[in-house]
Amino acid sequence: MTALLIDGNALSKTLRTQAAQRAAALTARGHQPGLAVVLVGANPASEVYVRNKIKACEDNGFFSHKDAYPDTLSEADLLARIDELNRDPKIHGILVQLPLPAHIDSHKVLEAIAPEKDVDGFHVANAGALMTGKPLFRPCTPYGVMKMFEAHDIPLQGANAVVIGRSNIVGKPMAMMLLEAGATVTICHSKTRDLAAHTRQADIVVAAVGKRNILTADMVKPGATVIDVGMNRDDAGKLCGDVDFAGVKEVAGHITPVPGGVGPMTITMLLINTIEAAERAAAAA
């Protein structure tokens, strides 16, 4: 049995078309959705991510604004700029690209973003509201994974789900969303004693640790759904995930590739969150 591929590019295309239609409707009413992206320093990976986010905005009828600062920018100046963006009615979403330079407290910066413009879903108000199932925004990567489950009719209610990774960006919110959908959730991490004992029981495995081959074929229950959130490089410098794709695809029922799986969905859900912020602002105007 070879697993069915969950194609993030195809699903992204569909969702971006819907986002573009919603953006056009808002723009016609004088409320073009606007996203501000703030980049501090010259991290090459961050520059690529920011470029992709700006392009996605431009391609789908969103207004986008990019602030690029040297890594010498002070924390106070960054906080002052966020305050300006919070008060700018043309901006509905604010995204500060992580990581930030060491002298800037990223927690303080993320908390400075107005919760109603926190399209990454990282503000403590949104992270906390996720516990009650009522956040203004859900973090983009796990939100995108949930859309993948939905698009492929993968049953979550009563399913045993294992999330490998406990980051605030993916692991924890992913576990909360699966729990909300009725799954029985286990979170595994670097201190987990016998990872395979957990994953072999799982109907769904989400790997999100940034470590190559953390999940191999012998660790997967036949027919399970495997979601690979990892972004790594193999020995040849080629992009790969956390999952041994070649082996696991022969055992799993569904699997996401890297690249072309979860990655495109993250930016797509950023657009969806931004359009929702703009629609709320327009309704309140």
Swiss-Prot record:
Catalytic activity reported: (6R)-5,10-methylene-5,6,7,8-tetrahydrofolate + NADP(+) = (6R)-5,10-methenyltetrahydrofolate + NADPH; (6R)-5,10-methenyltetrahydrofolate + H2O = (6R)-10-formyltetrahydrofolate + H(+)
The Gene Ontology terms for molecular function here are: methenyltetrahydrofolate cyclohydrolase activity; methylenetetrahydrofolate dehydrogenase (NADP+) activity
Amino-acid positions noted as binding NADP(+) in the UniProt annotation, renumbered to this chain: 165-167, 190
A Pfam family that the UniProt record links to this protein: THF_DHG_CYH_C
What does the record give as its pathway?
One-carbon metabolism; tetrahydrofolate interconversion
Q: Which GO terms describe its biological process?
A: L-histidine biosynthetic process; methionine biosynthetic process; purine nucleotide biosynthetic process; tetrahydrofolate interconversion
Question: Which cellular component terms (GO) are annotated to the entry?
Answer: cytosol
Entry EC number(s): 1.5.1.5, 3.5.4.9
| UniProt keyword terms in alphabetical order | Amino-acid biosynthesis, Histidine biosynthesis, Hydrolase, Methionine biosynthesis, Multifunctional enzyme, NADP, One-carbon metabolism, Oxidoreductase, Purine biosynthesis
Which residues does UniProt assign to the signal peptide? none
- Is the keyword Plastid assigned to this protein? no
| CDD domains given in the database record | NAD_bind_m-THF_DH_Cyclohyd
InterPro entries on file: Aminoacid_DH-like_N_sf, NAD(P)-bd_dom_sf, THF_DH/CycHdrlase, THF_DH/CycHdrlase_cat_dom, THF_DH/CycHdrlase_CS, THF_DH/CycHdrlase_NAD-bd_dom
Function description: Catalyzes the oxidation of 5,10-methylenetetrahydrofolate to 5,10-methenyltetrahydrofolate and then the hydrolysis of 5,10-methenyltetrahydrofolate to 10-formyltetrahydrofolate.
What family, per the record? Answer: Belongs to the tetrahydrofolate dehydrogenase/cyclohydrolase family.
Assembly, in brief, is:
Homodimer.
Q: What is this protein called?
A: Bifunctional protein FolD
Q: Which organism is it from?
A: Burkholderia ambifaria (strain ATCC BAA-244 / DSM 16087 / CCUG 44356 / LMG 19182 / AMMD) (Burkholderia cepacia (strain AMMD))
